[in-house]
């Protein structure tokens, strides 16, 4: 199967998206559209791609907190790309979210509810009957609610369940759904995580390139499957300390 020639990236200014775009270009991707909250953060990526590869890059500013996809008809710009990537995410202020409804809703909005207009349009009836792929970054946090990050985990769990439904809907379609349950990644969002548990965003990108047309749910790195199995089955008294 021919490699992706075009990619539509939501969360284009994230470190993970940065390295995925570079690795896509290395493998022959020629056209990119970056959706980001702050377009200035895309400058380094755009400069690198244009200097090293013959690519076409467009971008648009969109804040997932404001749901601009519906307000300014941004979803009409989605078009037909070979790969759609959702790499956006917001951990938020975990302590504040326990008592502040605004921060709690901010976490749920950015990580799930305001992604829905995009995902629904990406997987419209016409598009899923053609070849293409949707990669969605979820999180191992979605596997069990824990005191340390249950708002973030709940939002990612909702995203995972929704996309799992899409995965099954597209089971016999040429369009593939790939749900990535990522563990700790060495990015600003994962700055407080133990370093020995972190994987670099470049390694994440290289791993995804090994099987670009893969369908299904996967843990990244793979050993998080074992870790989260243990987390899911431990008694509540122990889980309350996580």
Regions found by a protein language model. Name each.
Residues 13-14:
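Conserved glycine-rich cofactor-binding loop
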Residues 29-44:
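Conserved glycine-rich Rossmann-like NAD(P)H-binding loop of the short-chain dehydrogenase/reductase
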Residues 85-93:
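Conserved NAD(P)H cofactor-binding loop of Rossmann-fold oxidoreductase domains
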Residues 90, 97-117, 159:
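Catalytic Tyr-X3-Lys loop
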Residues 119, 155:
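Active-site helix of classical SDR
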Residues 139:
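Residue(s) in the substrate-gating loop at a strand-loop-helix junction
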Residues 144-150, 193:
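Active-site loop immediately N-terminal to the catalytic Tyr-X3-Lys motif
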Residues 179, 194-229:
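C-terminal helical subdomain
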